[in-house]
């Protein structure tokens, strides 16, 4: 699948000329799908056509963490539907040339395609435009290329990754699952919970510590309270609007009570 909230940037000779998110053109928040209009905008702003592009970089590399993926499949034995879904997604992302040919007929793609591991792309996007020449960078989200977090030291043109948190543990999944449980079902509703949090009381602090907790090399989830690691959680984007199925398990309801 082409995931939610896609954006495009157009650097020319090392200088950023244009950047845009597809949702700004589609007028659908977190629009999910191939970002044809954002690409067209960036090409116009840069004064070039698709055939003039030298390098096409994508924030996903299916080859990243491949041994981790194989090990998880062998040890955890996830549902066949979950495995097939991941394979379909990888195949879809590999078809970028076909997507561009449909969106820009008559403009052949001559650029080399560069696959950038998900969290390395996040780190690059913040460090490269920061005022610092040396900094510690941390990337935390749901999942990308079988990892949910990465951190390292960046210096000059060198982007270092010293460690990662791998699937199935994820603070993004933890936050999204609790957001769903609290009655905010839409993708991206986490900001609403964040805004409401200062007005609440830590009544369930002890219970929540069972869901996510620190370990020696990072953090882990209490996996019995989540579904994503053992079965396929539906992800759809009807009309461009992303929707993710329920991430929490029945055990979470037993711990915290009925969903709100």
Task: Report each predicted region and the residues it spans.
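Short acidic/glycine-rich loops and adjacent helix/strand connectors
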Residues: 1-260
């Amino acid at each position: 699948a082409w995931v939610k909230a896609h954006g495009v940037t157009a650097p020319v000779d090392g200088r950023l000329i244009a950047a845009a998110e597809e949702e700004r053109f589609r007028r659908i928040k977190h629009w999910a799908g191939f970002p044809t209009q954002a690409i067209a905008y960036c090409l116009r702003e840069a004064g070039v056509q698709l055939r003039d592009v030298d390098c096409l970089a994508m924030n996903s590399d299916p080859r990243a963490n491949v041994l981790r993926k194989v090990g998880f499949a062998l040890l955890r034995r996830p549902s066949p539907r979950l495995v097939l879904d991941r394979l379909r997604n990888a195949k879809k992302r590999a078809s970028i040339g076909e997507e561009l040919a449909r969106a820009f007929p008559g403009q052949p793609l001559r650029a080399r395609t560069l696959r950038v591991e998900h969290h390395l792309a996040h780190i690059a996007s913040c460090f490269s435009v920061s005022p610092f020449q040396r900094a510690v960078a941390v990337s935390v989200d749901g999942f990308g290329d079988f990892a949910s977090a990465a951190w390292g030291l960046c210096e000059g043109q060198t982007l270092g990754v010293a460690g990662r948190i791998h699937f199935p543990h994820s603070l993004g999944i933890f936050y999204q699952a609790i957001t769903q449980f609290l009655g905010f079902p839409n993708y991206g509703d986490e900001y609403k919970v964040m805004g409401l949090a200062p007005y609440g009381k830590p009544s369930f602090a002890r219970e929540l510590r069972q869901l996510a907790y620190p370990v020696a090399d990072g953090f882990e989830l209490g996996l019995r309270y989540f579904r994503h690691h053992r079965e396929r959680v539906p992800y759809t984007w009807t009309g461009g609007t992303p929707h993710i199925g329920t991430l929490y398990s029945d055990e979470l309801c037993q711990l915290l009570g009925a969903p709100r």
